[in-house]
């Protein structure tokens, strides 16, 4: 209780310097100024804390491969300077007068969505990621609720968001590991439940990285029999430790034999160019394959119409993160069942190095930035 009171007192003391004269919120973060993965400090402002908004002081921010694709201009033209980060965990520092979901001092998170039209059929169903007007993303989105300003992400000290689009983080959550759940967690949780995977099902995960190792944990918890497909021998031990019954090195032709028509469900998390037909052929009749990996545009995998004909009643579908209600459901489930990403905590002055390691395939699962180190990164950059 004393810690909470001290936190609130501190927020009151700094409030006069936190807000610009027009009510906008000063923020500082680490930004890319070109497609080269190099970060420098950036001071900017976020929109004012409205009646239905909360201000979150960011504690941890995950690094997603999507951040890198966007920063490197690999999906669509990027507006620089660019502050990435859509896996955000922190503490509520201020609430608008109409806010009921949060109070100052609560833990709160932000995933990939910070707003949407709220009026279309998808939004009314809690499927905000499919908003007919377009979801407003955590970064590099035109925020049509706030004069079309370009959103900046969570590699920063704070974020302003509508309470409706913020996720409640349970008090007992492991804050150092919770942030990636808000993207990697829901991205894999959603299709697994959409396809109604159940105990005893024979399933596969293609790609054992940030997304893949989350998928394995959810599938194992459900009691499914999981086979993992990846490119190297280096991840075989990790596959076993995570609970997989088998590991297949796709570069070993001997191991690939006998895999066709074997699985009722496959989730592909591969963020590079590959042949999806190889995995479709591994499905049983009526089996389903969910594609969640998002490579750079030039590496997008394709399937011809004839390949789909020969898929023979096997289903292939894409899955995009999850809506706000499902994200909350996923987070509550994950914390209750101790399902977390395996992370490496890094200081803010190591983002350059972390990006390069992800690009080079040298990261095992997930990097998380300790945003308490932001001030030190800013000071060291000025030297």
Positions of PLM-derived features:
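Glycine-rich cofactor phosphate-binding loops and adjacent beta1-alpha1 units
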Residues: 195-202, 225-315, 374-383
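Short N-terminal strand-loop motif that marks the start
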Residues: 21-89, 153, 157-161, 372-383
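Bacterial Sec-dependent N-terminal signal peptides
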Residues: 1-22
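Cysteine-cluster motifs in flexible loop/terminal segments that predominantly coordinate metals
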Residues: 112-164
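Glycine-rich beta-strand-centered segment in the early N-terminal region that forms part
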Residues: 47-61, 74-124, 129, 170-173
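C-terminal hydrophobic helical "lid"/dimerization subdomain
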Residues: 22-25, 324-383
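Mid-domain Rossmann-like dinucleotide-binding core that forms the NAD(H)/NADP(H) cofactor-binding site
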Residues: 157, 164-166, 170-252
